[in-house]
């Protein structure tokens, strides 16, 4: 049998074998492919006979070889698809799902009450034209204390109150450093600065029902021309009404903070008794909610802001305290213990 006849016979016999194969013959298919098209396969052996052909027949037979290779390659690919489809079908049949079985309820997590409070407060201030600015939790001593008018010998620098990492690096005790950095960069030719800076802060406190070594604060700052105590009071009245009810009133009591002058403690009329006196307000009719004041001129000057031309106010409130007051929570540790029975109450 001449070479051309052998090529035709190889094509026909291989196609016939492939046609007889079922989808379950994956290994047999691979073995046949190697036997026919492999480096030592039948087609390769026939190719060796080209050198013995007359010169005029070599191109003709060579073309036939390529045609047979292409036809068989395509045939093997088609059969491989059949085998793969059969494999998938068998897998589906063996893993059939019973769609009549009742579904299993997926337990969803709860948004933490502190996240809810924080977002609510941020939304209130965003609606008043404030910007929200984040900052570093690991802070320089300079920004945490000196820029807030807290000199080296101030009691707040005591090692018992602050987590120092090194002599000049610490875990921030408030979010005020964010305000200082933002004040440094603000362009007052474009208008006043109105910002809040939410985030975690750290103190060397012993954890108990009312204290935690870490907690959350939102501090606010407004600086511009002709900013007055009346602007501060109006802002505080707005936040108290939004958080505790439209019929709430506030009062300002003189206080002291190094970075504000004058400084005030802010009380809100008790939302449980309406100011008549109860166990929540300790019979006073008022509940302390935050501290505030007019920005100290020294704080402005350290940012290169002319305190003769510009003034401002600042305030700081704690999300934990806001949540405890609103929901009657009596132990701050509940916020951090990860107990779903606690967090799911505030959905």
Swiss-Prot record:
Catalytic activity field: tRNA(Phe) + L-phenylalanine + ATP = L-phenylalanyl-tRNA(Phe) + AMP + diphosphate + H(+)
Cell compartment(s), UniProt: Cytoplasm
Predominant localisation class: cytoplasm
Residues bound to Mg(2+): 261
Record bears the keyword Phosphoprotein: no
GO cellular component terms, A-Z: cytoplasm
Biological processes per GO annotation: phenylalanyl-tRNA aminoacylation
Alphabetical UniProt keywords: Aminoacyl-tRNA synthetase, ATP-binding, Cytoplasm, Ligase, Magnesium, Metal-binding, Nucleotide-binding, Protein biosynthesis
Annotated cofactor note: Binds 2 magnesium ions per tetramer.
Keyword hit for Magnesium: yes
Cofactor (UniProt): Mg(2+)
Molecular function as annotated in GO: ATP binding; catalytic activity, acting on a protein; magnesium ion binding; phenylalanine-tRNA ligase activity; transferase activity; tRNA binding
Enzyme class: ligase
Annotated family: Belongs to the class-II aminoacyl-tRNA synthetase family. Phe-tRNA synthetase alpha subunit type 1 subfamily.
Oligomer and partners: Tetramer of two alpha and two beta subunits.
Protein name listed in UniProt: Phenylalanine--tRNA ligase alpha subunit
């Amino acid at each position: 049998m001449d070479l051309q006849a052998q090529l035709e016979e190889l094509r026909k016999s291989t196609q016939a074998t492939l046609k007889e194969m079922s989808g379950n013959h994956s290994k047999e298919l691979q073995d046949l492919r190697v036997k026919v098209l492999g480096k030592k396969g039948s087609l390769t052996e026939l190719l060796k006979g080209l050198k013995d052909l007359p010169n005029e027949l070599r191109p003709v037979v060579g073309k036939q070889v390529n045609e047979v290779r292409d036809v068989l390659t395509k045939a093997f690919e088609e059969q491989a698809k059949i085998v793969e489809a059969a494999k998938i079908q068998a897998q589906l049949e063996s893993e059939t799902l019973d769609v009549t079985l009742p579904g299993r309820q997926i337990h969803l997590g709860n948004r933490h009450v502190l996240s809810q409070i924080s977002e609510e407060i941020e939304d209130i201030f965003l609606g008043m034209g404030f910007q929200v600015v984040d900052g570093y939790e690991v802070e320089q001593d300079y920004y945490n204390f000196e820029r807030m008018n807290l000199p080296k010998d101030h009691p707040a620098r005591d090692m018992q109150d602050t987590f120092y990492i090194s002599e000049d690096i610490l875990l921030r005790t408030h979010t005020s450093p964010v305000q200082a950095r933002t004040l440094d960069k603000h362009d007052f030719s474009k208008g006043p600065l109105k910002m809040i800076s939410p985030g975690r802060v750290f103190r060397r406190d012993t954890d108990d029902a009312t204290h935690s070594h870490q907690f959350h604060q939102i501090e606010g700052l407004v600086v511009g021309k002709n900013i007055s105590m009346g602007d501060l009071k109006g802002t505080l009245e707005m936040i108290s009404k939004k958080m505790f009810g439209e019929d709430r009133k506030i009062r300002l009591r003189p206080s002291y903070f190094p970075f504000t002058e004058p400084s005030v403690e802010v009380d809100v009329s008790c939302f449980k008794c309406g100011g008549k006196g109860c166990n929540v307000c300790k019979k006073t009719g008022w509940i302390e909610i935050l501290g505030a004041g007019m920005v100290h001129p020294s704080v402005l000057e350290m940012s290169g802001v002319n305190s003769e031309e510009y003034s401002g106010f600042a305030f700081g409130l704690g999300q934990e305290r806001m949540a405890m007051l609103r929901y009657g929570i009596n132990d701050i540790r509940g916020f951090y213990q990860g107990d779903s029975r606690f967090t799911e109450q505030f959905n």
